[in-house]
Amino acid sequence: MKVISSIHELRDQLRGQNRTAFVPTMGNLHEGHLSLMRLARQHGDPVVASIFVNRLQFGPNEDFDKYPRTMEADIEKLQKENVYVLFAPTEKDLYPEPQEYRVHPPHDLGDILEGEFRPGFFQGVCTVVMKLMSCVQPRVAVFGKKDYQQLMIVRRMCNQFALPTDIIAAETVRDTDGLALSSRNRYLQAAERAEAPKLAAELNRVRDAVLSGERDFAKVEQAAMAALAARGWQPDYIAVRKRSDLLPPGPQDANAQLVVLAAAKLGATRLIDNLEI
């Protein structure tokens, strides 16, 4: 596996490749990330991964400085997955000049749910993904359903900019107790880690209620948030939405495919999760 930081060297290395499969990450790789690499290999060859902790998607009071950086361990894991190239640019490599041009997602999708609680987050995500796509020029790119809203925004962005890249959705990988794998799980204290699966448990309760015929979505959302709050969580949202556009389902949407999404803080750690219904 070649580890490359230069955009020009990356393009030279990939010249002539027309089936490249790309997996962008921020590093601190776990089994969820590695499952993306395996899925990428099913859809293209060679597989290119990137590691870049993108300052643009972190708010002023978020965890950019303490976000876990484990490059040596990440390289070993990617080598075992037979990744062809790891693109690991520095901030100066990727942003040699101030990034004056930004990609703004549409308000209807970018300013709800995560966008409401993390202003500017999706602008930062779209900008770096667009830049990484320009560098790698992949045939396919793999994103996890764990970040459901991000997946939808990136897919729409690629469609509307006519990028020649198909976005492949990967299923969420969970620990044996149901907790969705995340690099931020390492922030959890021991007692918090034992409590953390309750987020997925509440999502399952909401999903079961909807599948049993409950159509008062606000009632089940509020009940789930109250249950978490009673256990010491600080929920930002638990929301049943249409998979197609992440808007609330109305009476006319009886046959719409749904997803329930959640974000909540447990101690100092903010966790997100979702389940398709």
Curated annotation (Swiss-Prot):
GO molecular function: ATP binding; pantoate-beta-alanine ligase activity
Keywords assigned by UniProt, alphabetized: ATP-binding, Cytoplasm, Ligase, Nucleotide-binding, Pantothenate biosynthesis
Keyword Membrane among UniProt keywords: no
InterPro entries linked: Cyt_trans-like, Pantoate_ligase, Pantoate_ligase_C, Rossmann-like_a/b/a_fold
Subcellular locations according to the entry: Cytoplasm
Binding site for ATP: 26-33, 144-147, 173, 181-184
Binding site for (R)-pantoate: Q57, Q150
Organism superkingdom: Bacteria
Keyword Ligase: yes
UniProt: beta-alanine binding residues: Q57
UniProt xrefs under HAMAP family: PanC
Family, as annotated: Belongs to the pantothenate synthetase family.
The protein's assembly and partners: Homodimer.
Full protein name: Pantothenate synthetase
